[in-house]
Amino acid sequence: MRQVLLNIVIAFLWVLFQDEDSFKLSTFFAGYLIGILVIYILHRFFGQQFYLKKVWVGIKFLAVYLYQLITSSMTIINYILFKTKDLNPGLVTYETTLDNDWEVTFLTILIIITPGSTVIRISKEKKKFFIHAIDVSDKEKQKLLKSIRQYEGLILEVAE
């Protein structure tokens, strides 16, 4: 948070040093870019990672989630239209490495809002998920577990 505020201050100082008659967004943006460069060079002195890294992880997370959402939605549509007799619903267990309550909650929400699966129960230790899936054949089960591991990895990356 300190890095963002410092970057905004650098951008405003840049605007002031330009000695223009009116505030121009382009000048502020140029100052913000200069601030990014300065903060990137000096971020080691803050004792934190560079703040735009989290922004990049957030964008990557959003892209992965949207991809998973679209592909799982297409799979569910395919099941509904063509494979209603081939459904093999069941329970899948998944052991997580997440520690914080918010991380576990976030993973649970991601599983629930992805079509075709829902979390039925979480163990008392908050380490094991019991997930109901629309198809638990080996291939579909592996796809589900792969997407959950991918979510979990991104959550850990954001939590760093």
From Swiss-Prot:
| GO cellular component assignments | plasma membrane
Keyword field contains Transmembrane helix: yes
Subcellular localization, per the record?
Cell membrane
Q: Where are the transmembrane segments?
A: 22-42, 61-81, 102-122
Q: Which UniProt keywords apply?
A: Antiport, Cell membrane, Ion transport, Membrane, Transmembrane, Transmembrane helix, Transport
Keyword Transport in the entry? The reply is yes
A Pfam family annotated for this chain is MNHE
> MF terms per GO, please?
antiporter activity; monoatomic cation transmembrane transporter activity
Q: Look up and give the membrane topology term.
A: Multi-pass membrane protein
User: Subunit arrangement?
Assistant: May form a heterooligomeric complex that consists of seven subunits: mnhA2, mnhB2, mnhC2, mnhD2, mnhE2, mnhF2 and mnhG2.
Q: Which family does it belong to?
A: Belongs to the CPA3 antiporters (TC 2.A.63) subunit E family.
NCBIfam families assigned: PRK08965.1-1
Protein name from the UniProt record: Putative antiporter subunit mnhE2
